[in-house]
């Protein structure tokens, strides 16, 4: 359409993922991005196709440093370097952990400069979780504590499946204020949700003493991939959202009730 800039997502077929396969667009058989073989076949069928494009886009990173970007850019140059001089822009996608301590900013700058100098393109980076890395808390209370053999299990009023699905999907173990790794402190406890999903498990943590019913637990790094992915499976309520001021006081942003659940599934 007139006034629109058209781009194509490409698949450089160079995987840099380690432990995040669910977020790896370069995995074999991926549905995300056009491979060079697919591009060649499409152009053979429609030679005018390259003239329709203003830019190329790849999004292959997930919580990674710029060395993974450099590796990806090498693959892009190898697979698609001949196409880029005719493009106006190149989008590096997201997944850059720019705000993480130790992130190699200089390497990122070299990658951007390389693309600008080699192909004359404008370079874009998409905002990602680095914008809110290590921000946000999820507060939960202990509903029950049970013992199954040697395993102590605390049932919480939050759910991995409903409120932090990446814990199961990636998987990963979210940080918990004041807790240690399994076996680090006196009591190791498995924290789990109350849903019917047997695998609704947040992880194993150690404490100085087993948490009691009613105790408040605070998970960190919860601002990303939580509110946008949460759900009401088993009728689990959605967490209320509060803003914490610098002086420690809080302000209610929004709360959720039955009407929110009802409107999501019908009138």
Please report, for each region that a protein language model flagged, where it lies by residue.
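A structural signal for short, well-ordered beta-strand segments and their strand-loop junctions
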Residues: 7, 91, 123-125
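Charged (often Lys/Glu-rich) extended helix/loop segments that serve as interaction or gating elements
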Residues: 111, 122-267
């Amino acid at each position: 359409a007139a006034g629109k800039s058209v781009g194509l997502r490409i698949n450089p077929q160079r995987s840099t993922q380690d432990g995040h396969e669910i977020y790896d667009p370069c995995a074999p058989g991926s549905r995300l991005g056009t491979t060079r073989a697919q591009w060649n076949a499409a152009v053979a069928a429609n030679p005018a196709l390259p003239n329709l494009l203003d830019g190329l886009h790849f999004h292959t990173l997930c919580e990674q440093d710029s060395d993974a970007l450099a590796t990806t850019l090498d693959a892009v140059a190898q697979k698609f370097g001949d196409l880029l001089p005719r493009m106006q822009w190149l989008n590096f996608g997201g997944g850059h952990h720019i705000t993480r301590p130790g992130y190699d900013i200089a390497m990122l700058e070299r990658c951007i400069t390389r693309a600008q100098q080699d192909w004359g393109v404008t370079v874009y980076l998409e905002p990602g979780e680095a914008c809110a890395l290590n921000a946000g808390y999820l507060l939960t209370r202990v509903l029950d504590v049970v013992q199954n053999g040697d395993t102590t299990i605390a049932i919480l009023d939050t759910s991995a499946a409903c409120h932090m699905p990446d814990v199961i999907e990636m998987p990963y173990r979210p940080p918990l204020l004041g807790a240690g790794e399994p076996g680090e402190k006196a009591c190791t406890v498995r924290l789990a949700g109350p849903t019917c999903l047997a695998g609704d498990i947040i992880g194993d943590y150690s404490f100085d003493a087993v948490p009691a019913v009613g105790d408040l637990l605070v998970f960190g790094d919860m601002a990303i991939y939580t509110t946008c992915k949460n759900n009401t499976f088993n009728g689990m309520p959605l967490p209320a959202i509060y803003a914490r001021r610098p002086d420690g006081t809080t302000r209610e942003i929004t709360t959720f009730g039955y009407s929110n659940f009802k409107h999501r599934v019908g009138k």
